[in-house]
Amino acid sequence: MWDIFRERGNLVTVFNPREAELTPGTNHIVCEADQLRELSAVVVEIQDVGVRYFNYTKDVMQLMEMLALLGDEAPSLYIVDHLNPSGRVVEGTIPAVAGEMFVPKVAHRHGLTLGELVNLYASETGAKFPIHVISAMATDANRQLMPWTIAPASDIPGLFSSYLYSGGGLWNNTTLTPGIGTARPYEYIGAPFVKPLRPEELPQAHGALLRPCSFTPAAGRYAGERCFGFQIMLVPGEPYHSLLHTLHLMRWFREHYSAFEFEPAFWTKLADPVLEAYLKEEIGFDVVQEHMKLEEQKWIRKAKRYILYDDAPCRMKWFAIPKKCTIFAVQNC
């Protein structure tokens, strides 16, 4: 796309990730309002991963806030849409308390494309500047290439990463690492203070197997230190509720390891008092289960107002056997 604009002579500037494309770290695409003022159009092409706390998605929402402040001087916004690599399945709840900045009021795993998210955010913020969404079906590349052919970010190297990110992204704000700095981010979970585990110790979930393992991150938290924990191995073709399973696992670690802690930013990212109460051992899983079911249904009703394609977001049905701490799921699309 850059080459096309450059050949036509209408490319003014390119806003890239702050660091190298796949460098481990917290990448963002940033710009200043003054850089936007003289432009006639801003074209956004990123691959969203379907979870509300993905950095580049938040950067697009921040861009929209800046365009809104420019008023009549704001350039038009063009979104080159892509399919959601984690599909239309939703997980989680709409933020019930003040959450992270530039995060739309959507479920943790929202089931929308970036174009649909922009459509929603524009409606909720009352955006007046022109917005154009170029359909994900408009080009051969979008129709023929898988949405994860090019890695969206350094910590999202492939398809499995996006399926795990709704829950896995929350580990970043705890004293466990989700395998950042390894070849399998969000599949490996552990820390130096965790003792070697047995599979039967951990809460299990439908759609995934847990394999005890050790790993040494090359970057990020615990870089160069040997960590013990487990690997989440997804079962092909089976639905897996990453967020619910992650909450189960976090509560287990809180009960068994005093060194396991939540950072202040964790609660802002979670943005749900009911889920917070569960992690603090104030309520049981049955309450969380019913709460999440109702919230997912509520989000789907809202999301349907903003979809741009034929298929709509849907939820997976799941139930638990508390004695075994097992979560079963059946996709309901």
Describe the role of every protein-language-model region.
Residues 48-60:
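Glycine/threonine-rich flexible loop motifs
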